[in-house]
Amino acid sequence: MLASPARPTLRMLANHALSTPHCACSPAPAPRTASASRRRCVPVEARAAGVFGDRLAGVFGSRGLKHGGVQAPRPRVVRAEPRAGFAVVRSPRRLCGRSHAPQPPAHLGLGPGCFPAVAVVVPVPGSRAHRPFAALLVEGSFLGDPPIPPRRSGVLARGSAGADCLASSVTPGPSLWIPLLLVAGCVSCFVGLAVCVWMQARVSPAWPAGLFLLPR
């Protein structure tokens, strides 16, 4: 991917994100609108994405890494969207030897049977401490999930790095608030049943012993 001189390269953004504690911003090109404070940046979640992708890729096995104490290449930022609350980082490791997986697209430049390890990082909803959780992508497909269409995986592979450096919270999606509602319902039912058992006992025992006494 070629970058114009006025736009920071992917390597520059990734190195800044790996060396700064919060958000590494570099000046954007001349603004077209009146807002002169907009910057291009890579959020701190990108660092965790690279670490997560490297470690998980090492579990499944990879090729192309140097051994003997030589440090492996750093992960490359593929896409960062702080407004949407996620960052995509491609790990330098490759997952190889999985014959049942589809062949990688030609534009990725990988050999047959080798796939890029891409980590998607999403910050914990409501957390201001930037403690993200991540999931590994193998050529646009979540492990254990149906494959994402090639058009979507191409967007992830060729996406532009950099996004507006804005502090924003993430709204919990259905995959998060539905389990939370189920847990809250189970807890409320248990508490209600315990209170009923405690109140119906002949001799009101001291709390919380009444939780384990049934009425006679």
From Swiss-Prot:
Is-annotated flag, keyword Transmembrane helix? yes
Which UniProt key words apply to this protein?
A: Cytoplasm, Membrane, Transmembrane, Transmembrane helix
Task: Give the UniProt subcellular location, in the record's own words.
Answer: Cytoplasm; Membrane
Q: How does it sit in the membrane?
A: Single-pass membrane protein
GO cellular component annotations, sorted alphabetically? cytoplasm; membrane
Can you tell me where the transmembrane regions are?
177-197
Where does this protein chiefly localize?
Answer: cytoplasm
- How is this protein named in the record? Putative transmembrane protein RNF32-DT
Top-down, what is the taxonomic lineage of the species of origin? Eukaryota, Metazoa, Chordata, Craniata, Vertebrata
